[in-house]
C-alpha cells in the first residue's frame, strides 16, 4: 500500500487597482460613497487631482505616478481590490455594475503596478521634497464635497480613506490660508493637523481639533 499525502496550498493573494479618470468633483464624491457602501471590500480609494498652476509647488505628479497603465497627467480616482484572482475578478465585475464604470474612462493596474502605486500613496511621496506647509485633514465622508469645493484648483492635495482624509500642501507665502481652511474644517465637523511647517510659518497653533 502506498500512502499519498496531498497538500492544499492557500490561494495566492493578489491586488488590482481600478483607475477612473474624471475632474468632476461631484462624481468623485458619488463614487466614494458607492465604494464605501459596496460589499466588495475595497481596501483603498484615493482621488488625485491635477496640480495647480502655481510656481510655488513642485510639479512631480507625473513622475511620481509614472506607470505603464496610468495616465498620470489627468485627475483620477483609484481604488484597490484584494484577494485571489478569481475573487478579484468577481469583485471588479460587481463594482463595474455598482459604479457604472462602463460609462467612464478607466484603466487597470495589475499587481506589479498596484503594489508600488499604493506604497507611493501611503508614503506621501507626492509631498516628499516640499518646503511648504503640509496639512492632514480628517472630515466626515458626507461633508468632504464641501472641503473639495473650497480647496479645488487652489492648492496641491489629494484625498485618501475614500473621501475622509485630505493631504493639503499650502505654500509658505500663503500661511494665512491655513486659518481659512481651519474654519471650513471646523464647520463641517472635522479636524486639522499641521504635519510639516514651512520656515516662514508664524502661527502659535500647530494642531487644530474640534471637540
Predicted segments, located by residue:
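Conserved glycine-rich FAD pyrophosphate-binding loop
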Residues: 102-211
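C-terminal substrate-binding/cap subdomain adjacent to the FAD-binding core in PCMH-type
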Residues: 1-127
Amino acid at each position: 500500500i502506498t500512502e499519498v499525502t496531498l497538500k492544499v496550498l492557500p490561494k495566492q493573494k493578489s491586488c488590482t487597482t481600478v483607475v477612473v479618470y474624471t475632474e468632476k468633483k461631484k462624481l468623485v464624491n458619488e463614487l466614494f460613497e458607492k465604494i464605501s457602501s459596496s460589499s466588495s471590500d475595497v481596501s483603498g480609494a484615493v482621488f488625485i487631482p491635477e496640480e495647480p498652476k502655481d510656481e510655488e509647488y513642485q510639479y512631480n505628479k507625473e513622475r511620481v505616478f509614472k506607470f505603464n497603465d496610468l495616465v498620470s497627467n489627468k485627475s483620477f480616482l483609484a481604488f484597490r481590490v484584494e484577494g485571489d484572482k478569481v475573487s478579484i475578478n468577481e469583485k471588479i465585475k460587481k463594482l463595474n455594475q455598482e459604479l457604472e464604470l462602463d460609462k467612464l474612462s478607466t484603466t487597470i493596474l495589475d499587481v506589479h503596478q498596484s503594489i508600488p502605486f499604493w506604497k507611493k500613496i501611503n508614503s506621501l511621496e507626492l509631498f516628499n521634497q516640499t518646503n511648504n506647509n503640509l496639512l492632514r485633514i480628517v472630515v466626515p465622508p458626507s461633508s468632504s464635497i464641501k472641503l473639495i469645493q473650497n480647496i479645488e484648483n487652489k492648492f496641491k492635495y489629494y484625498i485618501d480613506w475614500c473621501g475622509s482624509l485630505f493631504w493639503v500642501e499650502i505654500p509658505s507665502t500663503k500661511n494665512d490660508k491655513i486659518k481659512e481652511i481651519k474654519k471650513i474644517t471646523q464647520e463641517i465637523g472635522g479636524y486639522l493637523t499641521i504635519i510639516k511647517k514651512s520656515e516662514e510659518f508664524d502661527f502659535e497653533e500647530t494642531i487644530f481639533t474640534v471637540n
